[in-house]
Amino acid sequence: MRVLRTVAAVRSAVEGWRASHERVALVPTMGNLHRGHLALVERAAQLADRVIVSIFVNPLQFNDRDDYSRYPRTFEKDQQYLDEYGVAVVFAPSLEDIYPQRLENVTHVEVPGLSDILEGASRLGHFRGVTTVVAVLFNIIQPQVAVFGEKDYQQLLIIRRMVADLLMPVEVESIATVRDKDGLALSSRNSYLTKEERARAPILFGALSHAAETIKEGWRNFSILEEEGRQRLVTAGFCPDYFHIRRAEDLAEPGGRENNLVVLAAAYLGKARLIDNMQVQLKSVD
């Protein structure tokens, strides 16, 4: 496994693989890796001959400077994890490599509509930062496939829309949310939880699961289910940002006869902001 830090170096590596007709996969990360990230790497290895994992803490997707500053940087530990998974290259660029014109002069890539609701409404500019850095990474590496997790469901839809709208020759693959045994979705931000908060954190998964099961049983008054979900979280000591039921394909508000839905929630528990979702697939509604 090689650690490459410059655009020229990683492009040179990719050019060599392409000359040998090898397929390249990219797994974009911000580091502080956990089992969820490693599952992405495993899937990427199934889809390509060479896997590149990028590690770059992207300031453009943080709307809170303190959040950016305290985001865990664990590069040495991340390297050890990835070395065991057959990764070909870890791409760890500097801020100047990714944004050579400095942050105040960056050319942004933004998906309108989808980027402004739910998570986008709570974290202004967040998705613009995500799509900008992903577009830059795609342009640098030009992978045939990139792998993302379904835990960040809205992000996944936005990246797929960006790729489709800009005719990027990249396949966007996803894997199901990786969870601990108690249901808590794995996240780098789980490290912010105290021991007591960690014990309560799976209540978020429970609230989503309850809503999903109730929908499967035929309940269609979604506003009541959303309020019930928020109240479950408040009662457990969470501070919810949102708890919504949306159409799975575009996150629009459902009309009541859709077959594919998703329940999405975000809530603070102490200093940790947890997000999760639960997809709901229904039989055809007569």
From Swiss-Prot:
Its EC number is 6.3.2.1. GO terms for biological process: pantothenate biosynthetic process. The active site is at H37. The keyword Ligase applies. It is found in: Cytoplasm. InterPro entries: Cyt_trans-like, Pantoate_ligase, Pantoate_ligase_C, Rossmann-like_a/b/a_fold. Beta-alanine binds at Q61. CDD domains: PanC (cd00560). (R)-pantoate binds at Q61, Q155. Pathway: Cofactor biosynthesis; (R)-pantothenate biosynthesis; (R)-pantothenate from (R)-pantoate and beta-alanine: step 1/1. Pfam families: Pantoate_ligase. GO terms for molecular function: ATP binding; pantoate-beta-alanine ligase activity. Belongs to the pantothenate synthetase family. Homodimer. This is Pantothenate synthetase. The lineage of its organism: Bacteria, Pseudomonadati, Pseudomonadota, Gammaproteobacteria, Chromatiales.
